[in-house]
Amino acid sequence: MIYEPVTLFVEETPPATNMSVATTDPNPRVPQAERSARMRRRLAQAAYEVIRDTGYVNFRTAAVARTAGVSQGAQLHHFPTKNSLAQAAIDYAWSQATADSLARIAQFVPSDDVIATLMDDSQAFFFSDYFRVALDILMAGGNDRDLRDSLVASTLVHRSRVERLWLETLVEQGWRLPDAEDVLALSMSITRGFAVRALVEPGRERFERLCARWVAIVAQAGLGPTRAAPRASSTRAR
C-alpha cells in the first residue's frame, strides 16, 4: 500500500526578542487519505477474522465493528453494505496469501526441486484459512451475482500473478512453455482438489504421500528442463 507523504504545516510566529527555541509538533497530523486507508484495512481484516471464526452464514456487520474496535457509524462510512465488507475480507485474504506466495517464490534457488517447491507453495495456499474463507463466501453467497462476480475478479487478479511467476520460474529453469503450463495447471488442480476434500476428510497424510508421488511422476515423465538452468537466481521484478 502506498501512502501519501506526511506534510507538517507550521504556523509562522514572530521572531523572539531574545533567544528563539526551535520546536516541532510531537503529534503531526496524519493525512486524511492515510487515516482512511488504515481504517479500511482495519475493517477488512476484522471482516476476514469474523468470517474465518464464525462462517459466512453467520456473518454480521455489527460483529465487524466490534472486532475492529470502531463504531458502527465508522464502519458504515467505509463499507455501507454486507457485500462490501465481504469483498473487503476477500481482498484482504488474497493480498495476504499473495504476499506469502511471493515471498516463497523469491526464496527459490535453482538447486531446489522446482516442482516440489511449487507443490509446497500450492499446499500452503489451498490449505490456508485464506482459501477456506474465500470458498466459504463463494459457496454461502454464491446466489448473489454481484458478490460472486467480485470474488471471481479478485481471485483472478491475485492468483494469476502468483501463477504467472511460477510459470516464469519454470521457464527460467529450462522448461518448455507448453510443458510448464500443463504441469503448473495440474499441480494447482491436484492441491486444490485435496484441499476441498480435506473439508470432509481431515488429515494430510494421504495428500502428502500422493504429492510426493506426483513430483516423482513429473520427473520420470521427462517433462523437466530441456536446457541447463541459470546458476544465479533471477533478478526480475516480482
Provide a role label for each language-model segment:
Residues T98-A99, A103, F126-L135, R145-V171, ...:
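Amphipathic alpha-helical packing segments from all-alpha helical-bundle domains
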Residues L147-V152, T169-R238:
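Hydrophobic/aromatic-rich alpha-helical bundle segments in the mid-to-C-terminal region
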